[in-house]
Amino acid sequence: MIFDKDDFKAYDADLWNAIAKEEERQQNNIELIASENVVSKAVMAAQGSILTNKYAEGYPGRRYYGGTDVVDVVETLAIERAKEIFGAKFANVQPHSGSQANCAAYISLIEPGDTVMGMDLASGGHLTHGAPVSFSGQTYNFVSYSVDPETELLDFDAILKQAQEVKPKLIVAGASAYSQIIDFSKFREIADAVGAKLMVDMAHIAGLVAAGLHPSPVPYAHITTTTTHKTLRGPRGGLILTNDEELAKKINSAIFPGIQGGPLEHVVAAKAVSFKEVLDPAFKEYAANVIKNSKAMADVFLQDPDFRIISGGTENHLFLVDVTKVVENGKVAQNLLDEVNITLNKNSIPYETLSPFKTSGIRIGAAAITARGFGEEESRKVAELIIKTLKNSENEAVLEEVRSAVKELTDAFPLYEE
């Protein structure tokens, strides 16, 4: 049974209507979740292509099934483009997600039970950097490092001292909620000083790295992992990079047959076309605008004494705001903003005192609104609308004003041009 879009609507109206409602939600909402973005129609077309039919266990030129000549071309395009973007000698484009990429990196670098240092979740790390609820924290002996309690910045002297004490086999750098530049060369110096390997998870900043607007970890890390969405503006998926041939072999084996079976070649195709977009000079302009818009929003909060920006500002696509002077917690803030069609997420802040289901902060990202065409003026307006909402949470007239302002912005910058 092969049918076109109109047949799909008639065949499964329930699913069609759900997708249509999500399209409407995305069009009419201001999206500030830092891990989300808006992909191109080319990315969606590739991901929805006939390649979804093809099973292709293995790697280009070394498949377990026949009929893979074409998908070999597709995957090779993705690999070569990824290598060109990040200046890496080897790339694996098959990971289904960033977590899968991290899992494969760990398998390639260490053994179960080995000691690993990773960034504390409340300081900005990720679940896969050693959280007890994650496979990482359950498989390896993770010891967390934190940001400085005063500056809320990475303290490399403290990290070195901690590394000398715990003697890790691996140090993991990278974050999901850290708004400042990360000096990967210092992390490599620390790793070398204690005889550890360095792995960098650059999932959040990969697009900025690709555009040359954040220092690249690739020359310093033994293995670099990333997602292909977020600031890279591709499909949801993972990517692993290295300059070490022996590690590249281990990575390939860790992905297949280690933790995955057949790759999702339709997603690999979507990665390939998104990588071509990243190689276009227009992407560097986009990435620069992401940072400008992030700073523009942060500046509005910095001028209001009722809010506190973690670490005092931002140098990338996101920042955290302590909202506890204005509302009870981050969850309350998230829910209030949902009501006015502004979407973001509650987020723990360094040395958090509330549960991760409530949190003291919210995380604000600029990647998706920038993809829609928002500039600094619109970004400042968005920050003002957030503040207006949180300070007038029980004033329905004010909240309706915010909804109208949100609608004006989303109408002015459609998700996709017809």
From Swiss-Prot:
Please give the SUPFAM superfamilies that the UniProt record associates with this protein.
Answer: PLP-dependent transferases
Cofactor(s) named in the record: pyridoxal 5'-phosphate
Task: Give, as one word, the top-level EC class.
Answer: transferase
Q: Name one GO molecular function term.
A: pyridoxal phosphate binding
Q: Which Gene3D superfamilies does the record associate with it?
A: Aspartate Aminotransferase, domain 1, Type I PLP-dependent aspartate aminotransferase-like (Major domain)
| Functional pathway | One-carbon metabolism; tetrahydrofolate interconversion; Amino-acid biosynthesis; glycine biosynthesis; glycine from L-serine: step 1/1
- The EC number(s) this enzyme carries: 2.1.2.1
Query: Does the keyword section mention Transferase?
Result: yes
Task: Write out the annotated subcellular location.
Answer: Cytoplasm
Identify the keywords attached in UniProt to this record, alphabetized: Amino-acid biosynthesis, Cytoplasm, One-carbon metabolism, Pyridoxal phosphate, Transferase
State the Pfam families in the record: SHMT
Highest taxon, organism lineage = Bacteria
List the residues marked with site Plays an important role in substrate specificity. Answer: 229
One cellular component term (GO) for this entry is: cytosol
Q: Which residues carry this modification: N6-(pyridoxal phosphate)lysine?
A: 230
Matching entries from NCBIfam families are given as: PRK00011.1 (NF000586)
Q: Which family does it belong to?
A: Belongs to the SHMT family.
List, alphabetically, the HAMAP family matched.
SHMT
- What name does UniProt use for this protein? Serine hydroxymethyltransferase
Q: Read off the lineage from the record.
A: Bacteria, Bacillati, Bacillota, Bacilli, Lactobacillales
Point out the gene that encodes the protein: glyA
